[in-house]
Amino acid sequence: VSHRFSVEIMKRLPEFTLEVAWSAGDGVAVLFGPSGAGKTLTLQCLAGLIRPDAGRIVVDDRVLFDSAAGVDLPPQHRRVGYVFQGYALFPHLTVGQNVAFGLRDRPRAERQRRVAEVMERLGLGGLEHRRPGELSGGQRQRVALGRALAIDPALLLLDEPLSALDAPLRRSLRDELRTILSGWGTAAVLVTHDFTEAYQLADRIVIYERGRVIQSAPRAELLWQPASEAVARIMGLRNVLRGTVVKAMPDRIQISWRGLVLEAVNSPTRSYLPPPDSPIAFFIRPEYVRLIRKDRGSPDAAHHMNLMRGRIVGESDFGTVWSLRLRLDAPGPPSQGDFDLEVEVPRLVYEILEIERDRHWELSIHRGSIHVLPT
């Protein structure tokens, strides 16, 4: 079954206004952004827990809310499942009773059949009579999902479902959650402010900032083509830099930055043609900056683009990778405080190149690794 839903709502609160419009289809739409951006408020409006001041919410051609037409379905008639932050399981009820909670108005035989079916699909068989306090974190997540999915929702809402867990458990349950959501086939909206989590769980990511949507795109498009500098910074991208346009062409852009002229690939989906001398923002992923080996002779211009030299002025050891902070051999203040570029190298490369001993390097950045951010 193919799913489609659209959200266009406005809600004024004393210190905050939410005004968003976005749509999504099959799979998982992740609402991503800083705390207080309006993500959970959007879920509450979708669920019918809060009434927007204006707008329209449609799920699979079924109108849940339409201020102009006077439609506002109560939560129990919306067919929306909700997994709350921290799961909010009822501690005094058994696992079976928690899963059955949304089925109270169904005949007893139907209720028992549905609970057994959901628990079997979620691998909860044999836990019917346990209480939430006797379960592992993974089991609690599945019970919360079971309670939300038992009503056969048209839309599943998940509010930071992994935020209360420690990091190793969060990683394993992220994989499990993705498997469950794709296997169940229910359209879902999930809230998080962890971009790794957003990317792993999403089919589409909707970026929120201060009550507005500033980009909505399939996850791969968002990763490589943020719509603006603001989106790049909210995503936590590193090496977000500013320069000046030298020349813009449909396939590439030349950028003046720190006394160099860099060549970048223009956006393949939206050619951006700013005039010469206009300010321009761009980003370079730290893992795509190459250190040129000194035992290989002079770099070949055919294989190495955007050559520059710099000195390591700081570094951080993250176990499997090293993050190096380099200041270029160029006059003027560095572009990021006391450094110009962050470069990420695997630990093995760090050891082979003896980076701990050798602090001065020539760098190369392929033009396809410099990503322009339209203003």
Put a short name on every predicted segment:
Residues 50-51, 58, 104:
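A position-specific signal in ABC ATPase nucleotide-binding domains
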Residues 56-78:
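ABC ATPase NBD Q-loop/coupling interface
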Residues 79, 85, 89-233:
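ABC ATPase nucleotide-binding domains
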